[in-house]
Amino acid sequence: DGMVVNNKTSERVHNNRGGVVEFLLANHPLDCPICDQAGECHLQDLGYEHGSAKTRYEEERRTFDPIDIGNKIKLHMNRCILCYRCVFVANQLTENRVHGVLHRGEHAEISTFIEQAVDNDFSGNMIDVCPVGALTDRTFRFKSRVWFLKPMEAERSCNKCCGKAVVWMFGNEIYRVTARKDKYGEVEDIDGKTAWLCNDCRFEHKSATDWNIAGPRVINRHSVISQGKYATSMEKPVKRIG
């Protein structure tokens, strides 16, 4: 009805967002130089756009030791912003969720119940939906920065999932496999269904011969990944092969 919402140009909105980001960063460590999520971290982007050069927070930050919550997933609770996305996704994908939010208030943390291991066939999707580096892929840990890799659309025949993924390559070697995401960072819908990946496709098939590679993934030209002389951007659609 003629309503105009200025969500980017309004100084008031920008200042309010800065306040929210400051709260999110209150307990967040400066791990960007060593975090595998650097370069594709939503909080890193928000901090760069709205954050202050220094914090006003003087109290001691919460600290946790990194733990393995499965044989493929590392949890860095120091980086967690308690968005609960991993919990919601686990509820969708399994009836036997073994992790969640423990305690309340400032003592709340993500962990497994009675230190059980997360081992369902789709647990790797929790890594994809984590907006920060709280959940990371142990098979990719510290191997490369994302801006050194080339994301390629690929697929394979799989009886557990859709088999459609993004393989991150350096030369002819696949360093990691992730679900396909849209421009908002959400896992894409393919054929009317969310394109979750099974753990077999994600962790066990990292040879180029395991996949039918269609071509470069379309990315935003402002992404740090595009700085690695990556030609395909959102403004220049990719020409499919086959």
Task: Name these PLM-found stretches.
Residues G2-H28, I34-G242:
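N-terminal export/assembly segments and adjacent metallocofactor-ligating motifs
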